[in-house]
Amino acid sequence: MNLIKLFIICCLLISITVKSFEIENDIDIDFEFDNSFDQSSSSAGSGSDSYDQDKCKGKPNPYPIFNKEPIFIASTANGKLYKTGDDSNQVSILHLYGEAYEMGYAHGTLLKEQVNELIPKFMEFAEIAIKEFIKTKFALRLPEFLIKLIEEFGVNAALDYVASATEQFTPKRFFNELLGLSDSSGIPYQTLLRMHMFPELVKATCSIVGAWSEATINGGLLQVRALDWGLENPLVNYPTLIVYHPQENDGGEFSILSWTSFIGALTGYSQRTGVCEKVWLSYNGTYTHNGMPFYFILRDILQYDNSIYEALNRIYNTPRTCAVYLGVGSNESNTASLLEVSMDVVRVFDDETPFPGFAPPVPEHPLFKDVVYVDKHSQPSTDPCMANSLSQSWSEITAQTLINTMGQMETGDLHSAVYDFKQNLVYVSVATTNIPFPFTNETLPLVSPAYKNQFIQFNMTKLFSEQPPLPPPNNSSSSDSNSNSNSDSSSSSDSNSNSN
């Protein structure tokens, strides 16, 4: 990989003209980055009077919480698969056990069909999305040589460069997990690796809230993660809650709300800690890819850290890449913190710290006792919606009031989550899942954003205590044989013992 990196840079320096590879595709996407990948230039974020100062643009979520037991689908060596949610809002629940390679192998076995559907669609989408992205003002976040690399050599070359630059800083277990996923699904390892570099190039606008103690109705910690990454992408059809059950002495159980085949943590909860992320659009410092991708740092926080102090120590001492806001909550302290994180900066904000950048807060972002928050716009935001909603429910904040805040703010289009640390519950909503991508002019209006859909309750005590699958009756030594036979048709005894 280092030779690839050196070759690419040398080619750019001597200005060799190479025609970039153009893929054939039938996906027609109208990319409006202000309304999908980046929403910083929305009218609310620019100080427009389109918002009434006492009202929000959206509405509270109208649906009751979906709390039916998950439905068992299949099991294999080191993995179990369930599903939950109604027909238009379904989420897969994937339990993984064992070492990293074994977890990846189980992932690719149980979701082989979905992986082989999603990856080609996503890589085609990524080619279009990144080329469109570098035409926008937000491409200024990328190093100039990387933009030139994309223009001259294509998107895959840029993804390969990022993979090469981050490799030495990334623990091998992540690569081993991808290798297992590749071996069982049949998707080339390099393709899976490229997919995992996409968030290093194109970030999402999101919202983060932490509320605790006097701000919440029961004094417990609640945390919001609203992911705004647009609806015109194939991830919409493949939401997956991945529950990891590491081996003894390798951290604790944790979960990530993700998609089939993506193992990084953009949204995650372990009861010990909860994490979330948002792009730091106003950052004007140094960029680098010589570090560990933020979504792998967040996953390590979930697996290994028990407090905000431990999470901060990890972030401080890990080489970092891009500029993001992070939200970290901790059951140990019953508090949450916001962070500004980049290659050369780590700033920590609590409920008494002026945000962003330690500057005096704008009127639309007042400080609240026992609350930290940042909305989906470029910061400092002049949209009063989130502050108004939080102030109205302060001292009586619940998971439901935060769900309503997301609806009022219209944030969390791809997925939305509320972590309830005291009850050990997670509430999740995803965008409409039963309209197949690519969307047409007729079908796109049918795709509803997550914040408008029904939220699903996940009992994390049950999920984290889920027992591993039963061994196959014949005790075969062949992992391939075990995986294939169990995933295609699980025995009735296995189904009965694993159903909830």
Curated annotation (Swiss-Prot):
Glycosylation: residue positions: 284, 331, 441, 459, 474-475
List UniProt keywords, sorted A-Z.
Glycoprotein, Secreted, Signal
Composition-biased stretches, type Low complexity, lie in: 475-500
Provide the protein's localization.
Secreted
Q: Do you know what upregulates this one?
A: Down-regulated by Pseudomonas aeruginosa, PAO1 strain and PA14 strain infection and down-regulated by phagocytic stimuli.
Q: Which InterPro entries match?
A: C45_proenzyme-like, DCD1A/B-like
Q: Signal peptide position in this chain?
A: 1-20
Look up the record and report any one GO term of the cellular component aspect.
extracellular region
Tell me the segments the record calls region Disordered: 464-500
Q: What is its main location?
A: secreted
Please report the name of this protein according to its UniProt entry: Protein dcd1B
